Amino acid sequence: LLAAALVMVSGSALAIDGQIDFYGRVAPGTCETHIVNKNGSSIIGDGEVRLQTAQIADITSAVQAQTPGAKAEDFAITADCQGAIKSLALTMSSPAYAANDGTLKNNTNVTVGGSAAATNVNIAVHDVTSGTPNLVKMNDASDAHILTLSGTSEGTYYFKASYVRADGSQDVTDGHVTTNALYTITYE
């Protein structure tokens, strides 16, 4: 009986299974966007902006409509459009992290590299395409940033992301700052 059981076990096949995650993007085919960081790295569609480390003493004020905050980091969004596109309108949103003042709240629910989240710190995004900084208000569909394309099918938005106090009357504590936003560009 033992010999029969060993024969049956040795004849059995072992199996392992797993999961493969696939990610992609389907665009309407009219405009392709790129996120360009300060190093000139360009990523189609999605991207990341890494701000320099700020000291607590650097983050002195709450958001201001026409003044970026501490350690402002440049980035751009380029749009390469086909056809007779005349203008672009950009809005930004963040279902999870938009603050009432139009900035992005820090994600305090994660630990990064063993570091807890900084408190009382938000990220402000200012559109500097025209030369004058203007706050991009998260989750405000009426705050469209218009870019007119002059005889070309390409356009570039220029931005600065910076640290600001979430509440000007509260102290900032150290830690990581992590957040995200979605951008939408409509065109005509």
What label would you give each PLM region?
Residues L14-E188:
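Mature extracellular/passenger domains of Gram-negative fimbrial/pilin and adhesin proteins
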Residues A5-V7:
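Residues within alpha-helical transmembrane segments of multi-pass membrane proteins, especially transporters
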Residues S10-S12:
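N-terminal signal peptide c-region/cleavage motif recognized by signal peptidases
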Residues L1-A3:
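Sec-dependent signal peptide recognition
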